Amino acid sequence: MIFDAQTHLFSRWYYAALWKQKHGSEPSDQDLHCMLKPVGLAAPPGDPAEHAALLVQQMRHHGVDRAVLFTSLPGEQATVAAACKASAGRLIGYTMVNPRAADALPLAHRDLTELGLRGIELFPAMHRFDPSDESLVYPFYELASRSCVPVFVHVGLLRVKLREKLGMACPYDMRYSDPLRLHRAAADHPKVNFILPHLGCGNLREAAMLGAACPNVHIDTSSSNQWMKLMPEPLTLERAMAVCLEAFGPNRILFGTDSSVLPRGYRYDIKESLELAMEAVELGAEDRGKIMGGNLARLLGINDE
């Protein structure tokens, strides 16, 4: 089974929310078209089921069986849940949580119990919080533990390029992007499975240290890994994979693409790059199968056999 650990819906709701943040009004279809066309994007179908059908069609074309579908802004959960419901089990949704919002905890509980979402996403730099803040964030880890769902924690470089292209503010605080800020929380919640993205996204060393210290921390391979261009020493995907195999082992690495926008669609090129990197580090067929889907299926309790 090929199971992508990270994709984004980037629904019409999402683009409308960006428009409202920028202009303070509800957009028309023409407004969205005018906003997206100059940056090379197309507005997706307004119907989540139709949008999901497009995603699944692209996944199947590239040999991908399932994918995790991220919520990309708090408030998009119902749309993501509707897309997942229409996908016949091929899309598995996560909910984005801003722990600083007053109603975040009851909404997260609703998302997991009523909407059927199966993971929690945290973006510490985006929402400006320490992921090991006991009073603010630990209740969400306890919810994840009770619900038997993983917790995704974004680390490393955070850029939402669409916001940048649209001239929108990106008031992030990357002091909270260090993977080691999660160490105390991961150690305090050994039954919670944590997932870091993008091979550490510029913090490979710190992500590897955390993975070596905490057996409940996993890492995904998603995105085109443009952050490697920022490293003071040359770094390749093959070398990054070798480091992660040493720190996490083949049981805690998850294939992902970070696929999102239309018309580009599914990032099959990222999938192919990972397959070449695994071949380069001489990974056996069993371990490749774990990384490409088996590990994530285990975390989410999915068994297609």
Feature annotation, model-predicted:
Residues Q6, M59, V80, I120, ...:
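Conserved, mostly hydrophobic/aromatic
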Residues A81-A86, E206-H218, I270-E279:
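Short, electropositive alpha-helical surface patch
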Residues M1-H61, R66, V243, F248-L254, ...:
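Mid-to-C-terminal alpha-helical segments outside catalytic/metal-binding sites
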Residues F10-R12, P74-E76, R100-D103, L157-K161, ...:
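Active-site environment of divalent metal-dependent phosphoester hydrolases
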Residues R118-G119, D133-L254:
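Catalytic pocket-lining loop regions of alpha/beta-barrel enzymes
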Residues I2-A5, L69-F70, Y94-T95, F194-P197, ...:
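Active-site neighborhood of phospho(di)ester-bond hydrolases with catalytic His/Asp-centered motifs
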Residues D65-R66, S72-M174, S223:
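Active-site gating/metal-coordination segments in enzymes
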Residues H61-R66, A88-L91, A187-F194:
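Short, surface-exposed connector motifs at secondary-structure boundaries
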